[in-house]
Amino acid sequence: MEPKQTADARDSPPLLVFLEPAAEEVTAHTAPLSPNPQSARAAPGSAVRFFSDSAREEEAGEDEPLLKKSGPVSPRAARKGRTRLSSSSDRENMSGGHVGNGEFNVILDDLEFADIIHRAEQAIESGVFPERISQGSSGSYFVKDPKGKIIGVFKPKSEEPYGHLNPKWTKYFHKICCPCCFGRGCLVPNQGYLSEAGAYLVDEKLGLGVVPKTKVVWLVSETFNYSAIDRAKSRGKKYALEKVPKVGRKFHRIGLPPKVGSFQLFVDGYKEADYWLRKFETDPLPENTRKQLQCQFEKLVILDYVIRNTDRGNDNWLIRYDSQDDDELMEKGDDFPLKDWKEIKEPVIKIAAIDNGLAFPFKHPDEWRAYPFHWAWLPQAKVPFSQETRDLILPRISDMNFVQDLCEDLYELFKTDKGFDKATFEKQMSVMRGQILNLTQALKDGKTPIQLVQMPRVVVERSCSGSQGRIVQMSNAFTQTFHCRKPFFSSW
């Protein structure tokens, strides 16, 4: 990539029933699938970080760490190996002197990702700072390794489009000039970093493989946008440590406060989808490669639909197309041995779904804008879902235990946010369950992506008697409701 970056149906089969919408809002109760203990397994989640006691002190303008080191670790966290602990040496380092990035992220369940974060921290400590990305309406940064190579994209929570430290003025003018359309009324404000990590979690659970690895981490850099107060306090503490070491060593932290945000691995060789889609119109793909693209496209559709991405244009998903041009082969001429022609591989095409920070709404868009999926107008959206995609997805999402497991994993991720509200989270999951119900029906009926997005919008809420456990029992019921209110500007 270039640097751009209920009436309980106890006697009926245990299936969610897809209802046709009536003129008014319709409500029905359905019983889920029978328990399947094999599906109740742990799933990958986000990176979690535990601060040492001395590092918990909060400076003005930044969020304090939310996970406490003291107290018992939940069985779920212990089972998944998600616990992150700061060592005693970390506490000693934090109690005085300069605090490096290494004290903030100790990732135990993904050594490869931990190594990448470690290299990013080393680069920052050696003066190779993250570079702010000029595109977009928020503060996001290309993170580099000590050699200056881009290895990831970091999006701090405090610099999100509606964050208080957003360094770009686009949203400020939006708020002043058009306050009635400011923000997205269907989204939880300032949770974009969790949405990014949540999209990767959903992608991995469904086996899609289109979202680059994304987790929640903490980083510190001079190039991040800090308030004047934070920078002044940092300078004052450093000065005190230099002039009066006895006093300076008593500070809990020397330097700028860490920022929490999403860290997504950088993908090489990808370009914006718009670029390749235009090129494919004039230079059609070989049949096998076209099928590859269609399969990858269907995975993008499923991801966006399940998480109800409200910001999917053709400029924020990427395509990588590896092929050997005919001209390049002709240039080799006689120097290219005949036996090697048989070893020429077919072109490979891959899709990367980036920019997933505006997803997981707590209600369907029903105010000013519909926030449509822009891929719905592509020719690929008019082709029915392939059998390969149906075989991959249907066995998973047809099992309500799998869906419950997915909701539990998202809960473990989202609850780490300082402003987490369980009631709002349950509304987010109700929308997601409705999307999954529609997707299940569409795959069974052999519908196309465009027909999928035209299906009635559904919310599947947990009934009051429903259990909160991981294994869904037959007595657990969900209420299916059709959302009939449409936004003022609607595309379908």
From Swiss-Prot:
It catalyses: a 1,2-diacyl-sn-glycero-3-phospho-(1D-myo-inositol) + ATP = a 1,2-diacyl-sn-glycero-3-phospho-(1D-myo-inositol 4-phosphate) + ADP + H(+). It comes from the Eukaryota. This is Phosphatidylinositol 4-kinase type 2-beta. InterPro entries: Lsb6/PI4K2, PI3/4_kinase_cat_dom. Residues 133-139 are annotated as: G-loop. Belongs to the PI3/PI4-kinase family. Type II PI4K subfamily. Residues 168-181, 271-279, 368-377 are annotated as: Important for interaction with membranes. Residues 127-462 form the PI3K/PI4K catalytic domain. Residues 160-162 are annotated as: Important for substrate binding. ATP binds at S140, K155, Q264, L265, F266, V267, R278, K279, D355. Residues 1-11 have a biased composition (Basic and acidic residues). Disulfide bonds: none annotated. Contributes to the overall PI4-kinase activity of the cell. This contribution may be especially significant in plasma membrane, endosomal and Golgi compartments. The phosphorylation of phosphatidylinositol (PI) to PI4P is the first committed step in the generation of phosphatidylinositol 4,5-bisphosphate (PIP2), a precursor of the second messenger inositol 1,4,5-trisphosphate (InsP3). It is found in: Cytoplasm, Cytosol; Golgi apparatus membrane; Endoplasmic reticulum membrane; Cell membrane. Residues 353-373 are annotated as: Activation loop. Residues 1-98 are annotated as: Disordered. Gene3D superfamilies: 1.10.1070.20. It is a peripheral membrane protein. Pfam families: PI3_PI4_kinase (PF00454). Keywords: ATP-binding, Cell membrane, Cytoplasm, Endoplasmic reticulum, Endosome, Golgi apparatus, Kinase, Lipid metabolism, Membrane, Nucleotide-binding, Transferase. GO terms for biological process: phosphatidylinositol phosphate biosynthetic process. PROSITE patterns: PI3_4_KINASE_3 (PS50290). One of its GO terms (molecular function) is ATP binding. Its EC number is 2.7.1.67. It comes from Xenopus tropicalis (Western clawed frog).
